[in-house]
Amino acid sequence: MAFRYLWFAVACTALTSAVAHIFSGSACDFTGIDVDGAITRLIAKFPDHDFIGREKFYPVVAGFEMRGFNASGFHKLKQYGPAIPYCINGTRMVQVDFINTGVVVLTMPWRHCSGQEGTFSLRSELSRFTTQFHIRQSERDKGIKLFYQGPTIPLTTQNIQINVDGAGRSANAVAGILAMVFPAITKELWDQQFLYSLSRALHQALN
């Protein structure tokens, strides 16, 4: 029994030494690296608005046209929980969760041959997602730079809202009902457009 405890103590000591070696005095050392500060600066650089797609209207069905959409509110995203630093083959990485509390809105203008025009908008009351970055430290000023690694994975998406402005209350009500009746389709639409817009926002903020 005593030998078993002695072996356990030796194993713990060896493991502690190995961890200390990995996280200090090596390429995987996070000492003095302000990861949370880098994430805060990244969010501050997110664009307020980003127009994506065709600038001119294009036909969708007979008499009905749409054009590219505007993504807004990414600069209001918030970090959710602590950043998780780790290493893969000596490369410093960080995993970060973000939360969107309805501040990100995707808006697409539309118009009809009857003269009606308005916007189609999509938002999620609450969404949480996680992504990963490479971390590189400058040897000159010891500052760090993040590089988007991806992928971005949605974790939680709640209450996706579809609004149709300019077509009257009935059209807006129908859009809301369809969003509730077909939640899987609505979520897929949101995930595709949101994650693509987020990827663009990340690249713009980091470049």
Language-model-detected regions and their locations in the chain:
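Tubular lipid-binding modules of the TULIP superfamily
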Residues: 11-123, 128, 138, 207
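A short glycine/threonine-centered beta-strand motif
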Residues: 131-133
